[in-house]
Amino acid sequence: MMSIPMELMSIRNPNSTLLYRAHSRPPVKLCAPPRSLLPSRRHFSAPRAVVSYPGIRFGFTSPEVLLNRSVVAFAASHEDSGESGVEVGKEKSDIDVEDDTSKEAWKQTLESFKEQVSKMQSVSSEAYSVNSQKAMTVLKETSEQLRIQAEKAKEELGTKAKVVSEEGREYILKAAEESPSDVKEIVEAFASTEDLKNVSRANDFHVGIPYGLLLLVGGFINFMVSGSIPAIRFGVILGGALFALSLASLKSHRKGESSTKFLKGQMAIVAIIFLRELRLLLSQKSTFLGFFTTLTSGGVLGFYLYKMVVKREKGPTLEDGGEDESSDGFVRSEG
């Protein structure tokens, strides 16, 4: 224990004489705590000077003790900052290691993905080539089979068509023998032209008879259904006239006479029908049926013009005499 005289207290307290006079004893004691009760370096408690007086207790801290406390606190804070710096450095190094590890894992994943993609591409290309070859083989075989079947069907249809045409011709000839003379002439004329395959071998009545009959029947049906007056004028009247002129041309042809005048009459009727249908078509008042009629009448008119040019190129008619074998097998004799 240390004892401090009370005279030293006069520096801090001017009235210390009173205290000295009243109590010259006991001395001031400096109480230091036991060594075992001292805290760690971070928390340091300095000894305090205690002045005992009856009913009053004074205490103060020594300046040296305060200085030591600040030094200890600075050292503790320096140690804490050092430890925190070490911990931050360790955390940074751990983060860098983790980044490197993640980059390596990402690179490995990309490499494996590229390998898988390349394998899939190679497999898909091989499969595509194999499948394409198989498909081409199957298509070739299928096309060959279809071609063979088409040829067989064509041959069968041609055979059946010939049989049907022969049977139909025989039936028509038998029916014509029992029919009136006009019908018989028409049937014989159409049966002797070899199905009208060659346009140059066909005569004007080969086209005028069916076309005039079509106009006649079609105009009559149109008038009965719709009551149209043009159907009577351009269908029944002109169609009937065309049919009659074609029959006259057929009879003159069988007799060996010239049929040029009948050809001109048929051409005039067809020209009237064609111009009328063309006018309706250009004025946008015609339907699909009108377009078909215009196309048909134009084709018939072109055929008549062709036959007229052919007749003019042949020169004089047979009315002047001589013989000429027509395209339908009839022989014209001298008039």
From Swiss-Prot:
<dbReference type="GO" id="GO:0009706">
    <property type="term" value="C:chloroplast inner membrane"/>
</dbReference>
<feature type="region of interest" description="Disordered">
    <location>
        <begin position="82"/>
        <end position="101"/>
    </location>
</feature>
<comment type="function">
    <text>May be involved in free fatty acids export from the plastids.</text>
</comment>
<dbReference type="InterPro" id="IPR044890">
    <property type="entry name" value="TMEM14_sf"/>
</dbReference>
<keyword id="KW-0175">Coiled coil</keyword>
<dbReference type="GO" id="GO:0015908">
    <property type="term" value="P:fatty acid transport"/>
</dbReference>
<dbReference type="GO" id="GO:0031969">
    <property type="term" value="C:chloroplast membrane"/>
</dbReference>
<feature type="compositionally biased region" description="Basic and acidic residues">
    <location>
        <begin position="88"/>
        <end position="101"/>
    </location>
</feature>
<dbReference type="GO" id="GO:1905885">
    <property type="term" value="P:positive regulation of triglyceride transport"/>
</dbReference>
<dbReference type="GO" id="GO:0005794">
    <property type="term" value="C:Golgi apparatus"/>
</dbReference>
<dbReference type="GO" id="GO:0009793">
    <property type="term" value="P:embryo development ending in seed dormancy"/>
</dbReference>
<dbReference type="Pfam" id="PF03647">
    <property type="entry name" value="Tmemb_14"/>
</dbReference>
<keyword id="KW-0934">Plastid</keyword>
<dbReference type="GO" id="GO:0009507">
    <property type="term" value="C:chloroplast"/>
</dbReference>
<keyword id="KW-0472">Membrane</keyword>
<keyword id="KW-0150">Chloroplast</keyword>
<feature type="coiled-coil region">
    <location>
        <begin position="101"/>
        <end position="160"/>
    </location>
</feature>
<feature type="transmembrane region" description="Helical; Name=1">
    <location>
        <begin position="205"/>
        <end position="225"/>
    </location>
</feature>
<keyword id="KW-1133">Transmembrane helix</keyword>
<keyword id="KW-0809">Transit peptide</keyword>
<feature type="transmembrane region" description="Helical; Name=2">
    <location>
        <begin position="228"/>
        <end position="248"/>
    </location>
</feature>
<dbReference type="GO" id="GO:0009941">
    <property type="term" value="C:chloroplast envelope"/>
</dbReference>
<feature type="transit peptide" description="Chloroplast">
    <location>
        <begin position="1"/>
        <end position="72"/>
    </location>
</feature>
<comment type="similarity">
    <text>Belongs to the TMEM14 family.</text>
</comment>
<feature type="transmembrane region" description="Helical; Name=3">
    <location>
        <begin position="286"/>
        <end position="306"/>
    </location>
</feature>
<dbReference type="GO" id="GO:0019217">
    <property type="term" value="P:regulation of fatty acid metabolic process"/>
</dbReference>
<keyword id="KW-0812">Transmembrane</keyword>
<feature type="region of interest" description="Disordered">
    <location>
        <begin position="316"/>
        <end position="335"/>
    </location>
</feature>
<protein>
    <recommendedName>
        <fullName>Protein FATTY ACID EXPORT 3, chloroplastic</fullName>
    </recommendedName>
</protein>
<dbReference type="InterPro" id="IPR005349">
    <property type="entry name" value="TMEM14"/>
</dbReference>
<dbReference type="GO" id="GO:0009536">
    <property type="term" value="C:plastid"/>
</dbReference>
